[in-house]
């Protein structure tokens, strides 16, 4: 299945993608996932990417130093907001999510989108709970994209089709 982010931030008056966000209930088990995210960022000329789970936020940035995935660097892995722990689910080794997990993943995606909107509207209030290193990374890479753009779901979701 080709990579597609869950949330995108585009310029207000342009289709340019400023930030992609992939929100999952757990880290993907296949190692090529990071490569797919980097490739998507590279091909869409997206400067910033996030992979978020209830446990962590991983920040990526494109340095535009090469025309390969090597130009997309992992800035760091940071703790997620404490309120996201309600979305933790046990992973039973199956790649196929249950109906309950699919519904929970949809709710998590909406929670992440809402959090991004809150950070955009009041970064100081919503970033103060994080350690300094996390605040700095989000302030340097994520807040500028949020302040310049519009936060959107990236398209139809599998969980919508199952309703």
Describe the predicted segments one by one.
Residues 1-48, 58-163:
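A short, conserved, highly charged catalytic patch centered on acidic carboxylates
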Residues 52-54:
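Catalytic nucleophile loop
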